Amino acid sequence: MSCLKLLTSLCAAASLCIGTAQSAEPVKIRVSWIAPITNWAPMLAEKKELARHLGKSYVLEPVRYVGTPQMITALANGELEIANLAFSTLPIAIQNAGMSDLKVIADELQDGVDGYYSQGYMVLADGPIKKVEDLKGKVVATVAAGAAVDVAMRTMLRKHGLEDKRDYAMVEAPLPTMRAMLADKKADLVPLVLPFALDPELRRIARPLFLNRDVVGVTQLLTWTARQPFLDKNRDAMVDFAEDTLRITRWYLDPANRSEVMAISGRVTKQPPERFDWAFTRRDYYHAPDMVPNLDALQTNVAMMKDLGFVTTSIDVKKHADLSIFEAAAKRLK
């Protein structure tokens, strides 16, 4: 009789374990973004039918931020799993915010790659600013101190002998408001990223004073980053997520899907689809195959942060990279 009771207890325990495993919640993966189309997170959400593991091993939650510096706080507070950090905010997160466990896991986009788009820093076409030196005593707009566009602007102005506060004033404004800042003459120079840079209203009144590639050449502008403990704890779910992500990004980059890509772009921006014939073409930022980042370019880029005094020492980028998750996902799709 005691054997029967033991067998019954073992069966019940096994049943409980199976039930617990089956009822395990999918891993929540919150991914940051700033601009639609330019950032992958909102675009992934538009092609959920290609995400075979979505709702099973993980759930996706795109979260919008004003700029990459705010993502550092969210990462530190456990409010974000994947941050699309700029080269400028990566060393700040690692050194200043003390997140030594932060890892680069994938590419989001690169600027200045030969034959692809490079973002512009715009002035009024009929205004007085003809060269960088003309910005002395003027107002320059930025997203946030330490953001990628901010660092590129400061670097270019320094090359021409101009320093913040001493030679020009800097004001902060969200990217969608930059056209109005320029048009209303609240700023003399504004940074513009896609898709805002191709706004027809902007193009009618503005011209680029310089391009990002003029400052530093190829820029590993944005990378996906995550903290190592989260990656270690949720590796299987992350590989599933990476597999779905690569499947979707390949779909967007396929010229055969151009019409639907334009329709999606129009929907997420609430603008006419025909404005987005540039999206995911050579007129766009460069998106690396299988989202493999250019770590050599990134190493060069982060060195600017030390030069500008945002961090005290440079970091070894390769020691803060873990590309194995997306590598494993890419192998699944071959």
Predicted regions and their residues:
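N-terminal secretory signal peptides that target proteins for export/translocation
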Residues: 1-3
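Short, glycine-/small- and polar/acidic-enriched structural segments
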Residues: 24-163, 169-172, 188-194, 218
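Secondary-structure end/capping motifs
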Residues: 232-312
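Sec/Tat signal peptide C-region and signal peptidase I cleavage site
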Residues: 18-23
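Bacterial N-terminal signal peptides
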Residues: 5-17
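Pocket-lining segment of extracytoplasmic ligand-binding domains
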Residues: 88, 98, 176-267
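Conserved C-terminal helix/tail region of periplasmic/extracytoplasmic solute-binding proteins
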Residues: 302-334
